[in-house]
């Protein structure tokens, strides 16, 4: 079969193996992306041959490397992995598939080990996972998760799960940590310039990131991480993830909003009609957003919104969020606020700052960063405007501009148990890069004078260990609600 025919029939043109997709007739192909055995790095398939022969268990932990007194890490997302991934059982079909892939891939395969998991454990991975409460804030260098195998025949399993487990922790935790920085900046601005900052804060940052990430699943995980701190989102998969994995009936809200295609479809000569249609269609909903720079943002705000539709907007009883989507990211939104003030008026709040008539507000979401946001907020304040006039939106800045090194996430082995039951410290300490040194010995986390602190488990001395069992041998031991996560993150 030639290369084009291989691809046409669902085969990988390099390995010749069938891949997971659906054939032209709609039937599923053979490869199973949900195969837990293959949810790892390739080289880990060889690790069952590499440990000391007397090994019975390996303990490993996840942390953000480095030391700091700054509390800047939000732990979130492990429960998504536990419910969506680790709750699946391995089958003999998975074992056969993994063996085929490993051999074709140039690696040994532990068929006996995986067959043992199927027969002795019903296919569920014999692991115990301990973790901090989800949503908790901590410093770098504090263990977030600790995992160990519960079956001495599966000493290699702790390392095998590293790829999937670390990925499941670093991404949502990094997104939640970054979004918290935005929340702190917005809170500061609102506390200075708004009368009810805590009431306003949850809706001040919208998530527009769904289209800018690599997969629907990533949008859901990152979108849920954003919702830990805010309630406004257009990443529907984030709402679904919070609903499915944390029991949140509705973790986020959206509102009707236009895009350029729905506005430019009317043509430039009917731009005012396009805006008027938005008012007539959506004013009863209470709030809606209209992108207004398809042609000329200044003309749209000053003339169409500010003159032609001014009385209609004021009489509608709703709030129109005007969204500029181009121009200088700092100057343009501030100018729009000033133009709306000139046309619709503003009142002074108790702190002495101007608040636009309730019928109009501004959304700025054109590729802004946290630094941009701070500049916009500072300029608004300098001109005497409250931060409540502006709602921000971020897309890739929330969900995509992040990687494992953003907070230096790592998972490392810290202890090995031998067949007599004795634990031995395991650690790494590279002579040329001390920052990559790992912790030795099984870990615990306690509350200290400066926040959470890592201590050895054998030095706990009666103190409460905040690393608590959340999963064991296929069973969820702690089911965090989204309300609990949000309360921790406040």
Can you annotate each of these PLM segments?
Residues 17, 25-61, 65-68, 117-126, ...:
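Buried, small/hydrophobic-residue-enriched core segments of structured protein domains
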Residues 89-147:
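Glycine-rich, N-terminal phosphate-binding loop and its surrounding beta-alpha-beta segment
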Residues 58-110:
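Low-complexity, highly charged intrinsically disordered N-terminal segments
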Residues 3-4:
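Extreme N-terminal basic, low-complexity initiation segments
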């Amino acid at each position: 079969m030639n290369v084009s025919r291989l691809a046409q029939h669902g085969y990988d043109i390099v390995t010749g193996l069938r891949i997971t997709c659906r054939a032209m007739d709609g039937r599923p192909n053979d490869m199973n992306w949900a195969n837990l055995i293959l949810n790892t790095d390739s080289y880990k398939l060889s690790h069952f041959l590499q440990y000391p022969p007397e090994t019975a268990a390996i303990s490993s932990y996840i942390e953000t490397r480095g030391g700091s007194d700054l509390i800047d890490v939000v732990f979130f997302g492990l429960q998504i992995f536990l419910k969506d991934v680790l709750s699946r059982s391995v089958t003999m079909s998975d074992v056969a598939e993994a063996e085929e892939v490993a051999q074709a891939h140039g690696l040994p395969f532990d068929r006996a080990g995986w067959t043992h998991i199927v027969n002795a454990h019903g296919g569920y991975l014999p692991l115990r996972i301990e973790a901090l409460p989800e949503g908790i804030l901590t410093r770098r260098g504090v263990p977030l998760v600790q995992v160990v195998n519960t079956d001495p025949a599966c000493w290699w399993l702790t390392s095998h799960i590293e790829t999937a487990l670390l990925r499941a922790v670093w991404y949502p935790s990094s997104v939640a940590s970054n979004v918290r920085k935005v929340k702190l900046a917005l809170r500061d601005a609102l506390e200075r310039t708004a009368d009810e900052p805590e009431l306003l804060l949850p809706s001040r940052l919208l998530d527009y990131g769904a289209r800018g990430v690599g997969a629907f699943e990533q949008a859901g995980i990152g979108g849920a991480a954003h919702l830990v701190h805010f309630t406004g989102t257009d990443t529907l998969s984030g709402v679904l993830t919070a609903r499915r994995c944390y029991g949140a009936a509705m973790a986020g809200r959206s509102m009707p909003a236009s895009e350029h295609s729905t506005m430019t479809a009317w043509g430039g000569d009917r731009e005012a009609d396009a805006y008027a249609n938005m008012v007539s269609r959506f004013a009863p909903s209470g709030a809606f957003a209209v992108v207004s720079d398809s042609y000329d943002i200044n003309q749209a705000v000053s003339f169409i919104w500010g003159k032609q539709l001014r009385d209609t907007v004021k009489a509608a009883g709703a709030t129109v969020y005007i969204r500029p989507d181009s121009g200088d990211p700092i100057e343009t939104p501030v100018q729009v606020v000033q133009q709306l003030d000139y046309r619709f008026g503003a009142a002074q709040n108790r702190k002495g700052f101007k608040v636009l008539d309730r019928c109009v507000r501004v959304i700025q979401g054109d590729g802004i960063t946290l630094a941009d946001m701070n500049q916009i907020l500072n300029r608004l304040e300098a001109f005497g405007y409250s931060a409540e006039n502006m709602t921000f939106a971020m897309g890739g800045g929330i969900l995509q501009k992040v990687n494992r090194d953003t907070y230096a996430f790592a998972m490392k082995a810290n202890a090995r148990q031998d067949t007599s039951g004795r634990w031995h410290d395991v650690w790494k300490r590279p002579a040329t890069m001390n920052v990559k040194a790992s912790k030795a010995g099984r870990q615990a986390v306690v509350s200290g004078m400066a926040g959470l602190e890592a201590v050895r488990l054998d030095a706990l001395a009666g103190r409460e260990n905040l690393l608590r069992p959340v999963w064991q041998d296929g069973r969820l031991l702690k089911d965090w609600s989204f309300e609990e996560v949000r309360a921790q993150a406040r």
